[in-house]
Amino acid sequence: MKLTQGMRTIAAASLGLAALLPPALAQQTTKVDFSDETVGAESKSFLSVVGVWRVEQEGAKKVLAVDGRQWKEGQSSAGIADKARALYGERYAEFLDRVQAFAYFPYTVAKDVPDFSAGEIAVRFEGISGRIDQGAGILFNLKPNGDYLTVRANPLENNLVLWKFERGRRSSVEWVRNTPTATRQWHDLKVRIAGAKVEGYLDGKRYLEHTLPQPVSGRIGLWSKADSYVYFADYAVTPAK
């Protein structure tokens, strides 16, 4: 078929537009809804590894809360051995040893996503209290040895940080300042992953972009820090095609 000049123009415009769009995402988005869960209990959709995580009532809506008001470093969650087995099967021992040795930061793991390597992870959060921290993070790239990455916001610091936790030590990978994040207000946090490329969004604006040495692959969840008391809601996972 012979292309007319008009058809060529349309085709060129379409290609140009495609280059500007993010990688195509699958239609199937997994959303976590806490409406049928029991207030005061751990969520059925997550396995709490470090710290205290439970379903709470916030107005007419149920949310997942991390409660660090009585935080003690080294506080792995109740039933951690069984949870480690549920996450990693026969390889649970290494994960369990790392968690018990380095339970420095509260985190919980999504049950139904055994491996995430590309796409989007989003959540809404509200910092309720915390004198030291009000950390709200999306955890990803969790390995059987306990290493992971997290992009976290913090209403006390107004920054967005990509942290790496490796061999029991935390270090910053990318740090972005001046990201307005008021406490006691709901905010949208999103991570977009494509291979080794990580983008961090806060309230719809991209603040962070970093290329890792290796592609992302591992379990995902939520992360926090110290005495943070934070609500989470509308956790959604959209894998790339």
Give residue spans per PLM region.
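Bacterial N-terminal signal peptides that target proteins for export
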Residues: 2-14
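Extracellular glycan-recognition surfaces and repeat-rich motifs
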Residues: 41-91
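Short, aromatic/His-centered strand-loop micro-motif at the edge of beta-sheets
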Residues: 166-188
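Sec/Tat signal peptide C-region and signal peptidase I cleavage site
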Residues: 22-26
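Secretory/extracellular carbohydrate-interaction modules
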Residues: 69-166
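Ligand-recognition surfaces built from glycine- and aromatic
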Residues: 33, 215-241
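Short tryptophan-centered beta-strand motifs in secreted/extracellular beta-sheet-rich domains
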Residues: 34, 121-123, 184-200
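Short, solvent-exposed beta-strand-to-loop segments that form ligand-recognition rims
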Residues: 201-221
